[in-house]
Amino acid sequence: MNQVTDWVDPSFDDFLECRDISTITATSLGVNNSSHRRKNGPSTLESSKFPVRKRGNLSSLEQIYSLENSKESLSENEPWVDKYKPETQHELAVHKKKIEEVETWLKAQVLERQPKQGGSILLITGPPGCGKTTTIKVLSKEHGIQVQEWINPVLPDFQKDDFREIFNTESSFHMFPYQSQIAVFKEFLLRATKYNKLQMLGDDLRTDKKIILVEDLPNQFYRDSHTLHEVLRKYVRIGRCPLIFVISDSLSGDNNQRLLFPKEIQEECSISNISFNPVAPTIMMKFLNRIVTIEANKNGGKITVPDKTSLELLCQGCSGDIRSAINSLQFSSSKGENNLWPRKKGMSLKSDAVLSKSKRRKKPDRVFENQEVQAIGGKDVSLFLFRALGKILYCKRASLTELDSPRLPSHLSEYERDTLLVEPEEVVEMSHMPGDLFNLYLHQNYIDFFMDIDDIVRASEFLSFADILSGDWNTCSLLREYSTSIATRGVIHSNKARGYAHCQGGGSSFRPLHKPQWFLIYKKYRENCLAAKALFPDFCLPALCLQTQLLPYLALLTIPMRNQAQISFIQDIGRLPLKRHFGRLKMEALTDREHGMIDPDSGDEAQLNGRHSTEESLGEPTQASAPETWSLPLSQNSASELPASQPQPFSAQGDMEENIIIEDYESDGT
């Protein structure tokens, strides 16, 4: 009897029509329905005499039909980013060279890996939406490599009974069921490198080749990056499979790559670095056209098909982020969203480019174009420091006729310039940098773009005036924007060689940009101040007075000193050896993806404009503890307080002999 009742369809067919077939079977055969069947046993047996099974078959067909309709509706509402995600290399919107570079690394570190080889690490960087993670997954799938991806754990939801059990005074003491993210991350790396991935339902990939993918690091690593460095060092020793980190570039000034993976760690752990570029407009245009064609053929009149001009504006406004472009395309193609494309009729980007090449481009059209891009893309356009400096230093201009704008009178003709294609204030704002820091980079690189010494003098005057405006800490917050505007516009206006659109300014060849030497000089200055205060504490003078007034005279006096650290410091500060050749310091090149960050050893941002705190830089007069005499301290322990960058102590006799040799050499030369 029980076997018959197990296969009898329930009486509530209408309720079960909206449920899955597997769910119906499970509930009809489940244990939870046994009591219900025992209570309603006779009525169920009576109903089994009638042809209920045929009615059940009809309801099952209706359920299958409803499930198919629901799947179709779900596919229509599915995000196009997930619906059209690439499955092969040909579908990737990434440059072929980058794909080959990643594929070569995977073959060398996974497919051709030695048995006892340590853990290899790859760092992939690039802007958001350029296909970093997708490229790894697609290439791994094609080469039969398993991907074990780290996902930050979510804290479990506590129920009311859990809190009662934890804080129950009668029971024994209970700890919170919490484990730090760093501990969970270390355990994940250990398990992932030792054990293979579990074979889930529908997973046909069975191979021992695998990689570990980390895209979302625990937040604790951003506060304490040294913990991550220790994890990397240990993984290089004990790791059995490659480890890949994916970090997106940030244009807001937060350089996670420099914080988490400094150059020292990359060299120590032999970390490979592959940098992705934003998706090219041509590749993005081809990808969006394919999506529009498929959706138009599938949905017919359910979507609004954008024209070619709208797609061009969308590609230009998304700043190389294909994920943002696909989302904007899906949102704008929905029915009733025809007003998302505010543009001129008959205006295309290609026609606009033709106008600019033929020198017929006007300022109102340029302003309208910028408004179009901002309205369509839905994403703020930002600039890296390298490109922002290039726009200021190369200062491209648009040629204007007499009808476009009035000319200056003859006595002011030397100040006449063509109209700029960029707004300097907007360029600095899009670089997401403080204005005084941008002035430092501008001051370091502006000379190489000038051809006349008079223009350099005029530009240096503008930079000096800008530094004066931002030098006073009391008015710095109010005058910082004016200071940046004067510096950028002054440098642009002073360069007469680039004052007109037809001028090349010494050629349009590429010129490398460099980081400011101010950071290195100011770091050396701070170390000298701290060393002077540590080595000569009995002289109640600020560090600046010690180095400019006292120590140069002590170097000329014959006062016996037994402290080698003091002797070395006085010789380094108070004397300038004649054989030391002073020249330009070694400059560090500025890369195209680097942010303008303050040197970690140079202090706070307030030090950029020379506003040094009295306690750290100049040093307040420190009163020594009951000084009896003004003699130099003879303690040999002061040498340990000397910074590492200071020269090693050497005897004064050797320095005198060196000076004598130099004098003899010069006398022979004369």
Curated annotation (Swiss-Prot):
Phosphorylated. Phosphorylation on Ser-635 and Ser-645 is cell cycle-regulated, enhanced by genotoxic stress, and required for activation of checkpoint signaling. Phosphorylation is mediated by ATR upon UV or replication arrest, whereas it may be mediated both by ATR and ATM upon ionizing radiation. Phosphorylation on both sites is required for interaction with RAD1 but dispensable for interaction with RFC3 or RFC4. Phosphorylation at Thr-622 by ATM in response to DNA damage promotes interaction with NBN and recruitment of the MRN complex to DNA damage sites. Residues 620-651 have a biased composition (Polar residues). A motif (RAD1-binding motif) lies at residues 6-14. InterPro entries: Checkpoint_prot_Rad17_Rad24, P-loop_NTPase, Rad17/Rad24_fun/met. Residues 31-50, 593-670 are annotated as: Disordered. Keywords: ATP-binding, Cell cycle, Chromosome, DNA damage, Nucleotide-binding, Nucleus, Phosphoprotein. Its main location: nucleus. The modification Phosphoserine is found at residues 60, 75, 348, 635, 645. Residues 655-670 have a biased composition (Acidic residues). This is Cell cycle checkpoint protein RAD17. It comes from Chlorocebus aethiops (Green monkey).
